Structure formats: structure tokens, C-alpha cells
Regions:
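Serine-dependent carboxylesterase/thioesterase catalytic core
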Residues: 111-122, 128-245, 251, 258, ...
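Catalytic histidine neighborhood in serine/cysteine hydrolases
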Residues: 137-138, 270-287, 297
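Glycine-rich beta-alpha junction loops
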Residues: 254-257, 279-281
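Flexible, membrane-associating and regulatory peripheral segments of lipid-active enzymes
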Residues: 1-111, 125, 134, 309-314
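Short alpha-helix in the alpha/beta-hydrolase fold that links the catalytic acid
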Residues: 127, 260-267
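Post-His helix in hydrolase/transferase enzymes
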Residues: 288-302
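Short, proline-enriched alpha-helix->beta-strand connector loops that line the catalytic pocket
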Residues: 107-109, 242-248, 271-275
């Protein structure tokens, strides 16, 4: 019998490859539907930005971050100026009560969570609770406007949030976790706006680092066009980034239908400190709530590279 016949070729479990793929796709789809249903129930709780809790008296005075250097000029115009000097009227960040104490005893930095496209901070409700249970005392999430039309502008706004968070917590550096578009915004801030002096580790979940070709009917939205593989934004992020001090941990899944191809959620750049973490059978929405991924996020936030430790000690 011809072993190349798809009907006779089996996987490790003895199931024909075609049937195995169909079953796996069905499982991922059912999980995505369940995650979406739960998220729709939580979505109203994250519509509004929460005001930050007052800083605790025990929070030490903020350490001064190293001076920032201007990022290189982009392919389509002058470089975007990094945020320096006093920050005008900081926009409040959303705290997970009662997360207004000093940094955890294990040395965890404050964590700031960035949601994805057409979403809000409620997507991180399970992750925030999980981090709190495991000792993180400063876990915040922010909402950027659903009308955001430029990743660069959103990254500049993120910079203002980060400065306010550092001032309030007394920490010179923080960690970021971004889902989908949120990871791209965090990357632009750290890589192009000098945010690496503030961001020790950026964890991205299902972020289109190489761009994605999925959902072609959404191209009229300018942010979607920026997430296409050959966009000016992708070209800018591919430019040299010598000396970038942020450590990047990129989680990607072989079953993410929004990442086309799925490997586009991997991060590859010769100048960046990168760890790519592949997971199997996890859909796009589930990447923010999957137990395996959440455990991986905790591990990534606890594991600090030598380069990051050197910067913190500076």
C-alpha cells in the first residue's frame, strides 16, 4: 500500500494525519469560542480606565534611569523623539487592587499589561490574578484608545504611562506583557523610543513581529495596515537597534489563526536579546489565558538575563 496516501499516513497516535489535523483544529476552535464567550462577559469591566491607587508611604524614592539616546531615523521620515524630561499630566494606569505596595520581596518589578487590537484591560483579568497569587505586588494594566490609528503614537502614550508608573512605585524599571498588538506597541517603545532604559523584560503573546496576512478585509484600518509584513512600521522595526537593553520573550503558537504564517509571532532581530517560546494547540485569544502560557510568563518575569541585571545595577 502506498504510504504517501494521506488516508494511510498516521501520526504518533495512530490517527490519519488529515483526521488528526481536523480534530486539533476543532479543539482549538472550541477553546477560542469558550475564551471569547468568557471575555465578552468580562469586557464591560475593562472599558473604563481605573485611577491609580495612592502610592504607599514605604515606596522608596524613584531611582534615576540611565540617560536615553535618540533612536535612529525611520525609513519614512525623521526619528520619533524619545520621551525625556517632565511628563505632562500623566494618564492614570489601572491597578489591580490592592497592588499599591512596594516591589515584591523576591525583587519582582512592577508589571504593566498591554491588551490587543479592539480590546481592553479585561483580557488580562486571569493573568493579573495569577501574578498576584504568585507574589507580584505591582500589577497594572492600561487601556489605549480603540480609535488608535498609529502604533508609534500608542507607543509614545505608553511611555507616559511608564514614567507615571515608575514615579508612583519608586522603581526605575518595569516589566511589560503585551498581547497581540499590545506586544508590538511595547516593542516599538522599547526598541525605537528609548524605552529600554525603563523596560527590563517585554513578554509578547501572539504578537505579529514579522507582520501577518490574516483578516485581509480589515486593511482599511491604518493599524491593521501597519501590521502587514511589508509595512513601513515593520521596515522600521527591522532597522539596527544597537545597545537595546530590554530582554524580549516572544510566545507563539502553531495553532494561531491570526498569525499568518504562525511563525510571524516569533521575534528575530540581530541586535535584540530574544527568547522565542513555541506552544502547541493554543489559539490567538487563548494565549492570554492558557495555563501553560501563564506559567511561562511567570517564569519569564522571574528569569533575568545577565545584561538586564547589569543595567539594573548601573
Amino acid at each position: 500500500m502506498d504510504s504517501s496516501d494521506p488516508s494511510t499516513t498516521t501520526d504518533d497516535t495512530g490517527c490519519p494525519y488529515g483526521l488528526g489535523r481536523m480534530a486539533a483544529t476543532a479543539r482549538v476552535t472550541m477553546t477560542e469560542v469558550a475564551v471569547l464567550a468568557r471575555h465578552l462577559l468580562l469586557y464591560p469591566t475593562g472599558v473604563f480606565q481605573e485611577s491609580p491607587a495612592p502610592a504607599a508611604a514605604s515606596v522608596p524614592r524613584q531611582r534615576t534611569a540611565p540617560p536615553r539616546t535618540a533612536p535612529p531615523t525611520g525609513p519614512s521620515g525623521p526619528a520619533h523623539t524619545p520621551l525625556t524630561g517632565p511628563v505632562p499630566t500623566p494618564v492614570p494606569v489601572a491597578d489591580l487592587p490592592p497592588g499599591n505596595g512596594p516591589v515584591g520581596a523576591d525583587g519582582q518589578l512592577p508589571v504593566l499589561l498591554l491588551h490587543g487590537f479592539v480590546d481592553n484591560r479585561s483580557v488580562f483579568t486571569p493573568l493579573r490574578r495569577n501574578l498576584r497569587r504568585h507574589g507580584w505586588r505591582q500589577v497594572s494594566a492600561l487601556n489605549y484608545s480603540p480609535l488608535t490609528s498609529d502604533v508609534r503614537h500608542a507607543a509614545a502614550l505608553l511611555g507616559r504611562h511608564v514614567e507615571e508608573l515608575c514615579e508612583r512605585t519608586g522603581s526605575a524599571r518595569i516589566d511589560l506583557v503585551g498581547h497581540s498588538l499590545g506586544g508590538l506597541i511595547g516593542r516599538y517603545y522599547a526598541q525605537r523610543l528609548g524605552g529600554d532604559v525603563r523596560v527590563r523584560t517585554l513578554v509578547t503573546l501572539a504578537t505579529p513581529h514579522a507582520g501577518t496576512r490574516a483578516v485581509p478585509f480589515a486593511d482599511p484600518h491604518p493599524v491593521v495596515r501597519q501590521m502587514r509584513p511589508r509595512s513601513a512600521l515593520m521596515a522600521e522595526l527591522a532597522l539596527p537597534a544597537p545597545g537595546c537593553r530590554t530582554r524580549f520573550v516572544a510566545f507563539w503558537s502553531d495553532a494561531d489563526p491570526i498569525m499568518t504564517p504562525t511563525e510571524s509571532a516569533r521575534l528575530d532581530h540581530p541586535d535584540l536579546i530574544i527568547e522565542n517560546v513555541g506552544v502547541q494547540g493554543v489559539g490567538h485569544l487563548a494565549m492570554a489565558v492558557n495555563a501553560q502560557v501563564v506559567a511561562g510568563v511567570r517564569q519569564a518575569l522571574r528569569s533575568v538575563s545577565d545584561a538586564s541585571e547589569a543595567v539594573d545595577a548601573a
